[in-house]
UniProtKB/Swiss-Prot annotation:
<feature type="cross-link" description="Glycyl lysine isopeptide (Lys-Gly) (interchain with G-Cter in ubiquitin)">
    <location>
        <position position="994"/>
    </location>
</feature>
<feature type="compositionally biased region" description="Polar residues">
    <location>
        <begin position="513"/>
        <end position="529"/>
    </location>
</feature>
<dbReference type="InterPro" id="IPR046942">
    <property type="entry name" value="TET_oxygenase"/>
</dbReference>
<feature type="cross-link" description="Glycyl lysine isopeptide (Lys-Gly) (interchain with G-Cter in SUMO2)">
    <location>
        <position position="1219"/>
    </location>
</feature>
<comment type="similarity">
    <text>Belongs to the TET family.</text>
</comment>
<feature type="binding site">
    <location>
        <position position="84"/>
    </location>
    <ligand>
        <name>Zn(2+) 2</name>
    </ligand>
</feature>
<feature type="binding site">
    <location>
        <position position="968"/>
    </location>
    <ligand>
        <name>Zn(2+) 4</name>
    </ligand>
</feature>
<keyword id="KW-0862">Zinc</keyword>
<feature type="binding site">
    <location>
        <position position="984"/>
    </location>
    <ligand>
        <name>Zn(2+) 3</name>
    </ligand>
</feature>
<keyword id="KW-0479">Metal-binding</keyword>
<feature type="binding site">
    <location>
        <position position="916"/>
    </location>
    <ligand>
        <name>Zn(2+) 3</name>
    </ligand>
</feature>
<keyword id="KW-0217">Developmental protein</keyword>
<feature type="compositionally biased region" description="Polar residues">
    <location>
        <begin position="370"/>
        <end position="380"/>
    </location>
</feature>
<feature type="binding site">
    <location>
        <position position="1704"/>
    </location>
    <ligand>
        <name>Zn(2+) 3</name>
    </ligand>
</feature>
<keyword id="KW-0408">Iron</keyword>
<keyword id="KW-0863">Zinc-finger</keyword>
<feature type="binding site">
    <location>
        <position position="57"/>
    </location>
    <ligand>
        <name>Zn(2+) 1</name>
    </ligand>
</feature>
Length: 1795
C-alpha cells in the first residue's frame, strides 16, 4: 500500500493522490516500516520522490540528540546502517501528508498517536529500521492510523472522502493521520488514490498471497487442524463468525483457492501428515471453506458494500467498484481495469461467487472512495476488491512483512480474502486469524456489518479499524503481553467505531483495512522494526515495493492495529468482524504470531504482536521497504501468501512476502505468527507458482498479466513510483491468488523497484518500496541497507536478514537483555569517537561530573562531610600495565591514609579529551573507616581461625601469572595465600547461580562436615554484608541500586539480613596475591566492595608495616597535580608520605617448578586418574597378596607406607619442591593430598596425580594453598591446615607435613643435591612411613625428620620440614645426603621411598638393578644412588629387597622393578613414559623412579616391596592414578610410597593410600597428576640426579621428566640435578638461596613513567568500592604469605551476573534437566535401536566426557590388566615396557596403561 502511496505521491498533481503517496511515503519511507507513514519526508513532500534521501531538520529533539540509545535495533544491528530510532528526525519520520492526515484523524490520534505510538513502539522494540520516529512511526503510525481509522472508522464514510485523499494523498503523515485523513480527506481525490492504492494493495495482496502462500497454506492448514479439532469454532462463531468468515474471508477465496489448487497439485500443507500427494480432508475442508467463504463473502461482502452503499455483496461490489473506479481514474491503470473485470477475476480466481466478488469490489471501491485506507482497499479491490479484502488480512500479515503495501490491501483483502483466507487459515491460521481478526476486526461480522456500515465511510472506517486494530494489535504485539489484550482491544475498539467497525471488518479487510492497516501495519511494523531493524529494512524494501499499495499498506497496518485500532471501528461488528478479520489477519497477525511465537490460535494474532520480533520482522517489510521480491521467489511467496489465507500473514510475516526461502526464514524468526510462518514454509514447500496457482491456478497467470498491466498502468499514470499492479492483479491474487497475482506483481514490482516506488515481488509477497519510507530513516540508506540487500536477493537476502535479525536482534535484544544493561557512552561532542583503549573504561555508576570539583561536591554530599575528610586523587589512564618480569603485580605509587581526619579517598580519572558532563569519572572509593574497629578485629580472628582449619581454598586463575609459573601465594601449601569463596556466584554451566541444582545449598561450605563452623562463618558474613550495604548505598548509590534491582526476585542469592542486599557472594582472600584481572562475571553495572582486615601490626595510621598488601590499578599512573591542579601540593603529599613514590618494588621471585595446570587440564586429568584409580584398585584387589607382601616388607613401616602414600602425594608436591623448599613442601603436601596444591601447580606438573584429587578442582598451582582441613585427604584431616602444607613446599614451614616434606625434603635435597634428595626421600620415607602411618602430614614435620632420618635423618634434619628445607637448604646436607645416598643412605633414600618397602637395605639387590637403571640412566648404582642413581640404588635396594626379585631384578625396587635391569633404562623411560603420563617416573627417580619403576614395579608389584612400589605405582601408573599416585606420592614421598608406603598404601594400607591419595584426590589418582610433573621435579630436586631432571623440569613434561630422570640416572646428574634442583627451588623462590638469588625490583617498570601501578594501601576495617568488572586490578604479593596469620584478609563482596532467579534458578535447572533427560532417553532408545553397546550408547547418546575417557581407559586398564602382568614383573614389562617406554611415552596417557 505504501508503495501505492509512493507512486501516488509521485504525482504532484493529485493532492489527495499525492497525499496518498505521502502517506505511501509513510508506508514506504523511513518513518514507517513499510507503511506510507514510513515514507520519507521527501516522499511526503515530493510524492513520488520517496527514493530521495531527505535531510534531517536538525531542530527536532531526535535531531538534537547526540547519543544513540543503544537499545534499539538500529543501534544493536549496525548492519542495518540505520540511525538510532531515538535520533531519527521527526520530519523524516513523518510524511507531510501523513501529519495532516493524522491531524484529520485525531479520533485515533492517527498522526500524533500513530507516530508517537510508532515511535514509542519502535523505541521499546528497538526499531529495526532507521530512526525510531520515522520508520518506527511509520509502522506505529499505521497503528495510530489504524486506530484513527478505527476511531474515525464510523466517520470513514463521511470523512472518507477527505480522509481518503488524505490517506492517499495527504500521506505525509499517512501512517496515523492518513487514516484519519481518509475520513476527512476529499472523497474524489482520495478515491482516485484509494483506487490506486486499492490496485496496489490488490496487487500487493496478490503478490503477497502468492509469496505467502506457504504461510497462508500453513495457516490454513493450522486452521484446518484447529477446526477439525473444534469444527465449529472459528468460522461459525458469532462474533468470531465474523472473524471466522474473515477467517474464511481472511483466508480469501483467493487464498483458499490458491491453497486448494496447491493442495490439488500435490502441494500439501507444511504440517500435513497425510500419506500420499494429497491431503483429502484438507482438500475437502478447503472446498467447504471456499464455499462457506463464497457464501459468507456474498453475505459479508454485501455487508461490506452495504456499509458503503447497500449492504449486500452486489451493492458493495458496485460501491467498491465506483470507489475503485474513482480510484482507478486517478490511477489510470486502475481505471483501465474495470471493476467488473476485477470482480470477475476475483470470482474466478477465488472461486467465489460473482456476487461476493462484486461485493469485494464494491468494498474496494468504497475503500478507494474512502481516504487512503480506502485507497488501499480499493487497490486490493481493483484486482479483487473484496477478494483482496481477504488478502487484506493476508496482506495484513504481509503488511507486517511490508505493512505499507499490504495494509491497504489487507482491509479489502481481508474482506475478499476472508473467504479464501478462511479457506486457507481454517486449517490453522483461521483459528489464529479469527482470533487475530477478532483482535483486529471480526471479518465475518465486519463483512456482514460492512455492508451495513456506511459504504464509503465504512470501508474507510474498516480500513481505519483494521489499521486501528492493527496498530493496537501491533502495539500489543510490541508489548507482547498486550497482544492478546490487543485482540480484545481490537474487538472493543472495533466496536468503538461502530459505523466503521461493522464495515470495518470487511472494509478493514477491504477498504478500511487498507487505510487502517497501513497505520496499524506501520505500528506493528514499527514494533517489528524495533525488534528487527534489519528485518524491517528488508521488509521496508518489500514495503516500498508494495509502496503503491501504500494505502493498502496502511490497511495492512490496520490489520496489525486491528487488535487495538479495529476495536474502535469494530464496535458494531466487533465480534464477527474481529473474528473474521482475525482469521484474515490471522494469516498476517496470526501468521506473524505464529512466526514469532509460533502460536497458532487465532487470538495469537495479538500474541504475534506480542512477539514483536516476528511481527516486527513482518512490519519491517512494509515499513522499511517492501522487499523487492524476485519473480521466481514471487511465486513461492505467493504460494505462501496464498496458503496463509490473509495477505496479512505474508505482510505480517515479512517472510511471506519474501521469497519462499527467505520468507521461511522470516517466519522461522517470527514463528509467533503461526500462519505466517507456516505460510512461509508452505510457500517454500510448494513451488511458488503452485502457491500462486492453487487459489486460482488459472487466474494466477492472468493475475500476473493483470498485475503487470496494472503496474504498467500505474507506472504510466503515477510514474514508476506507483509501481503498483492494477486492481485486477490484486483481485486475481487477492484471496488465494493474491499469491497468484503476486507472482506477476513481483516481477513488476521488481521492475519498479529502481523507481521512486519499488515494486518488489517475492513469491506471493509484493513489496512496493518507496524511497520515502527509507528516506525518512535515511531512506533506503537506513532501512534499505538491510532492505536493499534483501532486495537484491530479495527474498533470499531479506529472509536471511530477517532471520538473522530475528535470531540475532530479536533474540539478542529481546531474549538477552543482558546486553541492554550495558550502558552506552554518553553522547558528547568532545571527541569524534570514544575509544576506551585510549581513555579507559567508561562507566558512571560510581559517580561522574564535568570537573574534579564537581566530584568533590558529589562525594561530600554523599559522605556528609567536607574539606579534608574527603580526599580526591587524580589518576591518569595509560593503558600500560605495570607488572614484574614474571607478570606479577607491582606498585609504583602508593596512596596511603595520611591522617585520621581523612575519611574518604576517591580516585578519579579525567577522560582524555572530554569536557562534557561525564568528563571526570570516579573509579575507586575508599572509606578508611568502613566498619567499626571492634568488628574488624573480631572478624579477623574468627575468619583466620575458621578458614585456617576448615577452609577449602578456591582455585583462581588470577592466582597465577600468565605463564602459570609463579608462586606468589607462597610455596607452603599449608600457609600459602589462598582465597575462599562463599555465597552465590555465577556458573557458566548453569549460566546462573552455581547452586542451581542444589536442594540445600551450603553457601558457606567448609572442608568436611562442620555445620557449626559454617554457621559461625555464615553469621560473620551475613552480619558484615548487612553492615556494609548501607555504606555502599551512601557512597555509590547508583551502583547499589543496580545491584538491588532483583533483590526481591532472587532473595536466595543475596547476602544480608536486612532489606537492601546488593551482594550475592563474598570471597575471603587471605594473603592472596591476585594478579591483574577484571571480574568478568560481575554484574555489568555493579561494583565490588572490599572490606580489608589487617594483621595487628598494621592497624595504625602513618605506620608502614614490614609486610603489607596493596590494591593496585596497574593501568594508571598518578597525576602530577592534586585535585585543584597544584603541583606543589602534590609534591607535598609525596613528601609527607600520603603518596609514596616507589623507585623499585623488590619482591622475591617465587616460581613453580612447572606451570600450574588449568582447570580444564586438571579436570581431564582428574577424570583419567579417577578412571585409572578404579582400575588400579581393581588391580590391587587382584594382586592383594603382592601388595601385602610389599606392605609386610615395609612392615613396621605400615604407617610409613601411609606416609609413603602421603609422601607420594607429597611427591607430587616435589615437583614444586624442585623449585623451592615450599615447592618440596608444597609438592609433598600437595601430593599429600592437597587438592589445591596439586591442582594448582603440582597438578600442572603431575598430570596424573591430581586428576582425581580434589586438587583437580583447584586451579592453584601445586604451590597454592591446600585445603586447610585437607579433610579431603584422609590423612591430612588430622592435621590442621599446616599439617597439610598443601601448597607449597614452604621449606621454611615445618607446618607442612614433614612426611610430605620428607619426600619433598628429599626432593629438595634432590634440588640441592640429587643424592641428598633421594636420601632425603629415604629419610623422609622413614619419617614419612610413620608420618604416613600417622596419615597426617601435619605430623610429618617431626616425622619428616624421621623420614629424612629414615635414611638421612641427620642428613637433613632440617627438622620437621627437613624434606622441603633440605630440598632447598641442605644443599650441602643434600650432598652429604647424596653421599649417604650412594651408600646405604642412597639405598635408604630409595628405601625411604623403598623404606616403606623395607628395601632400604637392598643396596645390592638394587645395586644390580640400579646399575642397570643407572646404566640406563648412565649411572652406576652408587652413582645413581647419589645422583638419582643413588636413590635409584636405594630404590633398587628397596625394590630389589622387598620385591620380587624379578621385579627387583628388573628394577631396583618396585620402582626399580619397573626399571628391571633388563628394561631399566628403557623400561624406566617406558614406564616413565607410561608413568610419565602418570607423572610418576618424571618425579625423581628417588620417588619418580619408584614411580617409574613401579611402572615396571607394578609388574614387579608381584614382589612385596616391588609390588608395593609397583602396585602403589601401579595404581598411579595403571590407573593413571597409579602413575599419578606414584608420581605425586613418590615425588613427595614417592620413595616411601613407592617402596613400602605406596605398597602398603596401595595394598597393605590402602586406607592410608586412600587417605593420602584421597586428599590428593585419589590414592594414586591425585599423586599421579602431581606426581608426573612434581615427581619429575622431585626427581630433579632430588634426583635431579638425572642431570636431565632439570631438563625435565624445564620441560615440565611429566613424560619428559620421567624420561629425563631415568636418562639423568643414565647420566650423572647428581650434582647438576642438585644444582638444577636448587635452581628450580630458587626459581620457585621457595628456597632461601632462591630468595637471595631471585629477587626482582621490576626495574623496567620504573624506567617508563607511563607504565601504570597506582596502589592504595587499604587499612584495617576500610571499605573499598570499585568497578572490578571494568577496571583491571590486582593485589601485590606478600613477602611472607601466611594465611594462618594473614597480613591482610580482603573480603570481597560482589554480585555476579544472572543471579536473578528465585531459589537459585532451581526451577530452570530442573526444567533443563528434564529436557536433557528426555533427550538422553531418546538417544538411548536410538542407541538401542542401532544396537550400540552401553559404552557406545553413552558416547553416542551423551557426551559424558566420562564416556570416552572411561571407555578408553578401561581398554587401557585391560592393557594394564596385561600389565598387571606388571605383576608378571620383568617378563612382560621387558619387551612390552621397552617398547612402551618410547612408543607409549605420553604425557597425557597414564603409564598405568602399560603397566
Amino acid at each position: 500500500m505504501s508503495q501505492f502511496q509512493v507512486p501516488l505521491a509521485v504525482q504532484p498533481d493529485l493532492p489527495g493522490l499525492y497525499d496518498f503517496p505521502q502517506r505511501q511515503v509513510m508506508v514506504g519511507s523511513f518513518p514507517g516500516s513499510g507503511l506510507s507513514m514510513a515514507g520519507s519526508e521527501s516522499q511526503l513532500r515530493g510524492g513520488g520522490d520517496g527514493r530521495k534521501k531527505r535531510k534531517r531538520c536538525g531542530t527536532c529533539e531526535p535531531c538534537r540528540r547526540l547519543e544513540n540509545c543503544g537499545a534499539c535495533t538500529s543501534c544493536t544491528n549496525r548492519r542495518t546502517h540505520q540511525i538510532c530510532k531515538l535520533r531519527k528526525c521527526e520530519v523524516l519520520k513523518k510524511k507531510v501528508g501523513l501529519l495532516k492526515e493524522v491531524e484529520i484523524k485525531a479520533g485515533e490520534g492517527a498522526g500524533p498517536w500513530g507516530q508517537g505510538a510508532a515511535v514509542k513502539t519502535g523505541s521499546e522494540l528497538s526499531p529495526v529500521d532507521g530512526p525510531v520516529p520515522g520508520q518506527m512511526d511509520s509502522g506505529p503510525v499505521y497503528h495510530g492510523d489504524s486506530r484513527q481509522l478505527s476511531a474515525s472508522g464510523v466517520p470513514v464514510n463521511g470523512a472518507r472522502e477527505p480522509a481518503g485523499p488524505s490517506l492517499l494523498g495527504t500521506g505525509g503523515p499517512w501512517r496515523v493521520d492518513q487514516k484519519p485523513d481518509w475520513e476527512a480527506a476529499p472523497g474524489p481525490a482520495h478515491t482516485a488514490r484509494l483506487e490506486d492504492a486499492h490496485d496496489l494493495v490488490a496487487f500487493s495482496a496478490v503478490a503477497e498471497a502468492v509469496s505467502s502462500y506457504g504461510a497462508l497454506s500453513t495457516r490454513l492448514y493450522e486452521t484446518f487442524n484447529r477446526e477439525m479439532s473444534r469444527e465449529a469454532g472459528n468460522n461459525s462463531r458469532g462474533p468470531r463468525p465474523g472473524p471466522e468468515g474473515c477467517s474464511a474471508g481472511s483466508e480469501d477465496l483467493d487464498t483458499l483457492q490458491t491453497a486448494l489448487a496447491l493442495a490439488r497439485h500435490g502441494m500439501k500443507p507444511p504440517n500435513c501428515n497425510c500419506d500420499g500427494p494429497e491431503c483429502p480432508d484438507y482438500l475437502e475442508w478447503l472446498e467447504g471453506k471456499i464455499k462457506s467463504v463464497v457464501m459468507e463473502g456474498g453475505e459479508e461482502r454485501p455487508r461490506l458494500p452495504g456499509p458503503l452503499p447497500p449492504g449486500e455483496a452486489g451493492l458493495p461490489a458496485p460501491s467498491t467498484r465506483p470507489l475503485l473506479s474513482s480510484e482507478v481514474p486517478q490511477i489510470s491503470p486502475q481505471e483501465g481495469l474495470p471493476l467488473s473485470q476485477s470482480a470477475l477475476s476475483i470470482a474466478k480466481e477465488k472461486n467465489i461467487s460473482l456476487q461476493t466478488a462484486i461485493a469485494i469490489e464494491a468494498l474496494t471501491q468504497l475503500s478507494s472512495a474512502l481516504p487512503q485506507p480506502s485507497h488501499s482497499t480499493p487497490q486490493a479491490s481493483c484486482p479483487l476488491p473484496e477478494a483482496l479484502s481477504p488478502p487484506a488480512p493476508f496482506r495484513s500479515p504481509q503488511s507486517y512483512l511490508r505493512a505499507p503495501s499490504w495494509p491497504v490491501v489487507p482491509p479489502e483483502e481481508h474482506s475478499s480474502f476472508a473467504p479464501d483466507s478462511s479457506a486457507f487459515p481454517p486449517a490453522t491460521p483461521r483459528t489464529e486469524f479469527p482470533e487475530a481478526w477478532g483482535t483486529d476486526t471480526p471479518p465475518a461480522t465486519p463483512r456482514s456489518s460492512w455492508p451495513m456500515p456506511r459504504p464509503s465511510p465504512d470501508p474507510m472506517a474498516e480500513l481505519e479499524q483494521l489499521l486501528g486494530s492493527a496498530s493496537d494489535y501491533i502495539q500489543s504485539v510490541f508489548k507482547r503481553p498486550e497482544a492478546l489484550p490487543t485482540k480484545p482491544k481490537v474487538k472493543v475498539e472495533a466496536p468503538s467505531s461502530s459505523p466503521a467497525p461493522a464495515p470495518s471488518p470487511v472494509l478493514q479487510r477491504e477498504a478500511p483495512t487498507p487505510s487502517s492497516e497501513p497505520d496499524t501495519h506501520q505500528k506493528a511494523q514499527t514494533a517489528l522494526q524495533q525488534h528487527l531493524h534489519h528485518k524491517r529494512s528488508l521488509f521496508l524494501e518489500q514495503v516500498h515495493d508494495t509502496s503503491f499499495p501504500a494505502p493498502s499498506e496502511p490497511s495492512a497496518p490496520g490489520w496489525w492495529p486491528p487488535p487495538s485500532s479495529p476495536v474502535p471501528r469494530l464496535p458494531d461488528r466487533p465480534p464477527k468482524e474481529k473474528k473474521k478479520k482475525l482469521p484474515t489477519p490471522a494469516g498476517g497477525p496470526v501468521g506473524t504470531e505464529k512466526a514469532a511465537p509460533g502460536i497458532k490460535p487465532s487470538v495469537r494474532k495479538p500474541i504475534q504482536i506480542k512477539k514483536s520480533r516476528p511481527r516486527e520482522a513482518q512490519p519491517l517489510f512494509p515499513p522499511v521497504r517492501q522487499i523487492v521480491l524476485e519473480g521466481l521467489r514471487s511465486p513461492a511467496s505467493q504460494e505462501v501468501q496464498a496458503h496463509p489465507p490473509a495477505p496479512l500473514p505474508a505482510s505480517q510475516g515479512s517472510a511471506v512476502p519474501l521469497p519462499p526461502e527467505p520468507s521461511l526464514a522470516l517466519f522461522a524468526p517470527s514463528p509467533s505468527r503461526d500462519s505466517l510462518l507456516p505460510p512461509t514454509q508452505e510457500m517454500r514447500s510448494p513451488s511458488p507458482m503452485t502457491a500462486l496457482q492453487p487459489g486460482s491456478t488459472g487466474p494466477l497467470p492472468p493475475a500476473d498479466d493483470k498485475l503487470e498491466e496494472l503496474i504498467r498502468q500505474f507506472e504510466a499514470e503515477f510514474g514508476d513510483s506507483f509501481g503498483l499492479p492494477g486492481p485486477p492483479s490484486v483481485p486475481i491474487q487477492d484471496p488465494e491468488n493474491q499469491q497468484t497475482c503476486l507472482p506477476a506483481p513481483e516481477s513488476p514490482f521488481a521492475t519498479r523497484s529502481p523507481k521512486q516506488i519499488k515494486i518488489e515481488s517475492s513469491g506471493a509477497v509484493t513489496v512496493l518500496s518507496t524511497t520515502c519510507f527509507h528516506s525518512e530513516e535515511g531512506g533506503q540508506e537506513a532501512t534499505p541497507t538491510k532492505a536493499e540487500n534483501p532486495l537484491t536477493p530479495t527474498l533470499s537476502g531479506f529472509l536471511e536478514s530477517p532471520l538473522k535479525y530475528l535470531d540475532t536482534p530479536t533474540k539478542s535484544l529481546l531474549d538477552t537483555p543482558a546486553k541492554r544493561a550495558q550502558a552506552e557512552f554518553p553522547t558528547c561532542d568532545c571527541v569524534e569517537q570514544i575509544v576506551e583503549k585510549d581513555e579507559g573504561p567508561y562507566y558512571t555508576h560510581l559517580g561522574s561530573g564535568p570537573t574534579v570539583a564537581s566530584i568533590r561536591e558529589l562525594m561530600e554530599e554523599r559522605y556528609g562531610e567536607k574539606g579534608k575528610a574527603i580526599r580526591i586523587e587524580k589518576v591518569i589512564y595509560t593503558g600500560k600495565e605495570g607488572k614484574s618480569s614474571r607478570g606479577c603485580p607491582i606498585a609504583k605509587w602508593v596512596i596511603r591514609r595520611h591522617t585520621l581526619e581523612e575519611k574518604l579517598l576517591c580516585l578519579v580519572r579525567h577522560r582524555a579529551g572530554h569536557h562534557c558532563q561525564n568528563a571526570v569519572i570516579v573509579i575507586l572509593i575508599l572509606a578508611w573507616e568502613g566498619i567499626p574497629r571492634s568488628l574488624g578485629d573480631t572478624l579477623y580472628q574468627e575468619l583466620t581461625d575458621t578458614l585456617r582449619k576448615y577452609g577449602n581454598p578456591t582455585s583462581r586463575r588470577c592466582g597465577l601469572n600468565d605463564d602459570r609459573t609463579c608462586a606468589c601465594q607462597g610455596k607452603d601449601p599449608n600457609t600459602c595465600g589462598a582465597s575462599f569463596s562463599f555465597g552465590c556466584s555465577w556458573s557458566m554451566y548453569f549460566n546462573g547461580c552455581k547452586y542451581a541444582r542444589s536442594k540445600t545449598p551450603r553457601k558457606f561450605r567448609l572442608a568436611g562436615d562442620n555445620p557449626k563452623e559454617e554457621e559461625v562463618l555464615r553469621k560473620s558474613f551475613q552480619d558484615l554484608a548487612t553492615e556494609v550495604a548501607p555504606l555502599y548505598k551512601r557512597l555509590a548509590p547508583q551502583a547499589y541500586q543496580n545491584q538491588v534491582t532483583n533483590e526481591e526476585i532472587a532473595i536466595d542469592c543475596r547476602l544480608g539480613l536486612k532489606e537492601g542486599r546488593p551482594f550475592a557472594g563474598v570471597t575471603a582472600c587471605m594473603d592472596f596475591c591476585a594478579h591483574a584481572h577484571k571480574d568478568q562475571h560481575n554484574l555489568y553495572n555493579g561494583c565490588t566492595v572490599v572490606c580489608t582486615l589487617t594483621k595487628e601490626d598494621n592497624r595504625c595510621v602513618g605506620k608502614i608495616p614490614e609486610d603489607e598488601q596493596l590494591h593496585v590499578l596497574p593501568l594508571y599512573k598518578m597525576a602530577n597535580t592534586d585535585e585543584f591542579g597544584s603541583e606543589e601540593n602534590q609534591n607535598a603529599k609525596v613528601g609527607s608520605g600520603a603518596i609514596q613514590v616507589l623507585t623499585a618494588f623488590p619482591r622475591e621471585v617465587r616460581r613453580l617448578p612447572e606451570p600450574a595446570k588449568s582447570c580444564r587440564q586438571r579436570q581431564l586429568e582428574a577424570r583419567k586418574a579417577a578412571a585409572e584409580k578404579k582400575k588400579i584398585q581393581k588391580e590391587k584387589l587382584s594382586t592383594p597378596e603382592k601388595i601385602k607382601q610389599e606392605a609386610l616388607e615395609l612392615a613396621g613401616i605400615t604407617s610409613d607406607p601411609g606416609l609413603s602414600l602421603k609422601g607420594g602425594l607429597s611427591q607430587q608436591g616435589l615437583k614444586p619442591s624442585l623449585k623451592v623448599e615450599p615447592q618440596n613442601h608444597f609438592s609433598s603436601f600437595k601430593y599429600s593430598g592437597n587438592a589445591v596444591v596439586e591442582s594448582y601447580s603440582v597438578l600442572g606438573n603431575c598430570r596424573p596425580s591430581d586428576p582425581y584429587s580434589m586438587n583437580s578442582v583447584y586451579s592453584y598451582h601445586s604451590y597454592y594453598a591446600q585445603p586447610s582441613l585437607t579433610s579431603v585427604n584422609g590423612f591430612h584431616s588430622k592435621y590442621a591446615l599446616p599439617s597439610f602444607s598443601y601448597y607449597g613446599f614452604p621449606s621454611s614451614n615445618p607446618v607442612f607435613p614433614s612426611q610430605f616434606l620428607g619426600p619433598g625434603a628429599w626432593g629438595h635435597s634432590g634440588s640441592s643435591g640429587s643424592f641428598e634428595k633421594k636420601p632425603d626421600l629415604h629419610a623422609l620415607h622413614n619419617s614419612l612411613s610413620p608420618a604416613y602411618g600417622g596419615a597426617e602430614f601435619a605430623e610429618l614435620p617431626s616425622q619428616a625428620v624421621p623420614t629424612d632420618a629414615h635414611h638421612p635423618t641427620p642428613h637433613h634434619q632440617q627438622p620437621a620440614y627437613p624434606g622441603p628445607k633440605e630440598y632447598l637448604l641442605p644443599k650441602a646436607p643434600l650432598l652429604h645426603s647424596v653421599s649417604r645416598d650412594p651408600s646405604p643412605f642412597a639405598q635408604s633414600s630409595n628405601c625411604y621411598n623403598r623404606s616403606i618397602k623395607q628395601e632400604p637395605v637392598d643396596p645390592l639387590t638394587q645395586a644390580e638393578p640400579v646399575p642397570r637403571d643407572a646404566g640406563k640412566m648412565g649411572k652406576t648404582p652408587l652413582s645413581e644412588v647419589s645422583q638419582n642413581g643413588g636413590p635409584s640404588h636405594l630404590w633398587g635396594q628397596y625394590s630389589g629387597g622387598p620385591s620380587m626379585s624379578p621385579k627387583r631384578t628388573n628394577g631396583v625396587g618396585g620402582s626399580w622393578g619397573v626399571f628391571s635391569s633388563g628394561e631399566s633404562p628403557a623400561i624406566v623411560p617406558d614406564k616413565l613414559s607410561s608413568f610419565g603420563a602418570s607423572c610418576l617416573a618424571p618425579s625423581h627417580f628417588t620417588d619418580g623412579q619408584w614411580g617409574l619403576f613401579p611402572g615396571e614395579g607394578q609388574q614387579a608389584a608381584s614382589h612385596s616391596g616391588g609390588r608395593l612400589r609397583g602396585k602403589p605405582w601401579s595404581p598411579c601408573k595403571f590407573g593413571n592414578s597409579t602413575s599419578a599416585l606414584a608420581g605425586p606420592s613418590l615425588t613427595e614421598k614417592p620413595w616411601a610410597l613407592g617402596a613400602g608406603d605406596f605398597n602398603s598404601a596401595l595394598k597393605g594400607s590402602p586406607g592410608f593410600q586412600d587417605k593420602l591419595w584421597n586428599p590428593m584426590k585419589g590414592e594414586e589418582g591425585r599423586i599421579p597428576a602431581a606426581g608426573a610433573s612434581q615427581l619429575d621435579r622431585a626427581w630433579q630436586s632430588f634426583g635431579l640426579p638425572l642431570g636431565s631432571s632439570e631438563k625435565l623440569f624445564g620441560a615440565l613434561k611429566s613424560e619428559e621428566k620421567l624420561w629425563d630422570p631415568f636418562s639423568l640416572e643414565e647420566g650423572p646428574a647428581e650434582e647438576p640435578p642438585s644444582k638444577g634442583a636448587v635452581k628450580e627451588e630458587k626459581g620457585g623462590g621457595g628456597a632461601e638461596e632462591e630468595e637471595e638469588e631471585l629477587w626482582s625490583d621490576s626495574e623496567h617498570n620504573f624506567l617508563d613513567e607511563n607504565i601504570g601501578g597506582v596502589a592504595v594501601a587499604p587499612a584495617h576495617g576500610s571499605i573499598l568500592i570499585e568497578c572490578a568488572r571494568r577496571e583491571l586490578h590486582a593485589t601485590t604479593p606478600l613477602k611472607k604469605p601466611n594465611r594462618c596469620h594473614p597480613t591482610r584478609i580482603s573480603l570481597v563482596f560482589y554480585q555476579h551476573k544472572n543471579l536473578n532467579q528465585p531459589n537459585h534458578g532451581l526451577a530452570l535447572w530442573e526444567a533443563k534437566m528434564k529436557q536433557l533427560a528426555e533427550r538422553a532417553r531418546a538417544r538411548q532408545e536410538e542407541a538401542a535401536r542401532l544396537g550400540l553397546g552401553q559404552q557406545e550408547a553413552k558416547l553416542y547418546g551423551k557426551k559424558r566426557k566420562w564416556g570416552g575417557t572411561v571407555v578408553a581407559e578401561p581398554q587401557q586398564k585391560e592393557k594394564k590388566g596385561v600389565v598387571p602382568t606388571r605383576q608378571a614383573l620383568a617378563v612382560p614389562t621387558d619387551s612390552a615396557v621397552t617398547v612402551s617406554s618410547y612408543a607409549y611415552t605420553k604425557v597425557t596417557g597414564p603409564y598405568s596403561r602399560w603397566i
